[in-house]
Regions:
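Structured, solvent-exposed acidic/aromatic patches
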Residues: 1-200, 204
Length: 205
């Protein structure tokens, strides 16, 4: 929301168009995960960078959210110009695709196709239209693992694309990122909890 408001009130928005529409792709990506999990959700006010007047924010139906996401992705794909030298780049701050506009565009089209498949049993006509738009777009779809969208935090090891700033990581990050998720409970700790199970008094006691 802050970025959208900054973009709206900037006197020279033309050179930031690619950056702005990348955020729309990412916004749709996050919204898709949320609406697929929870269904109806607050969306309209937030996507327009409005500040709700109360905590009782209106919910949009899942159909409305999907419709908005389709339009967001279509607008992003139509607006991002990979070869426009006047656009401000951000390779060092892009923790997903390192400033590669074409990969963002392929990711957007792939999201459109995924969404079309999701609604194919609910709205076949809309699904067919959106799928064809994604498949026929000039930038294409994700082609290989090189196009995978991954979020690599800067504190991740250099081998994983981070900067490995050494020592500032949260312990959970160390377990999930730095140790590749290969962290297990020690045998001593396992036995400790097992002993508690047998020695703890029952609720009746």
């Amino acid at each position: 929301r802050t970025l959208l408001r900054a973009y709206k009130f900037n006197e020279n928005t033309n050179k930031y168009k690619n950056l702005f529409y990348v955020t729309r792709i990412y916004y749709a990506f996050l919204a898709l995960a949320n609406t697929d999990t929870y269904g109806d959700m607050p969306f309209k006010e937030y996507v327009q960078a409005k500040i709700p007047e109360t905590n009782n924010v209106a919910y949009n139906t899942q159909a409305e959210v999907y419709d908005a996401m389709f339009r967001m992705l279509e607008q992003a794909v139509d607006s991002i110009k990979p070869n426009d030298a006047t656009q401000i780049g951000y390779a060092t701050d892009d923790i997903c695709y390192h400033g590669d506009w074409n990969k963002w565009l392929r990711f957007a089209n792939s999201l459109r196709l995924r969404m079309a498949l999701r609604i194919s049993n609910v709205d076949p006509a809309r699904a067919k239209e959106e799928a064809q738009n994604a498949l026929n777009n000039q930038y294409g779809l994700m082609q290989s693992n090189e196009d995978n969208m991954q979020i690599v935090p800067k504190y991740a090891p250099v081998s994983q694309g981070g900067t490995d700033d050494g020592g500032n990581e949260h312990p959970l990050v160390m377990c999930s990122v730095c140790y590749n998720g290969e962290s297990v409970m020690s045998k001593d700790l396992e036995n400790f909890y097992r002993c508690l199970l047998y020695t703890s008094p029952s609720p009746r006691d």
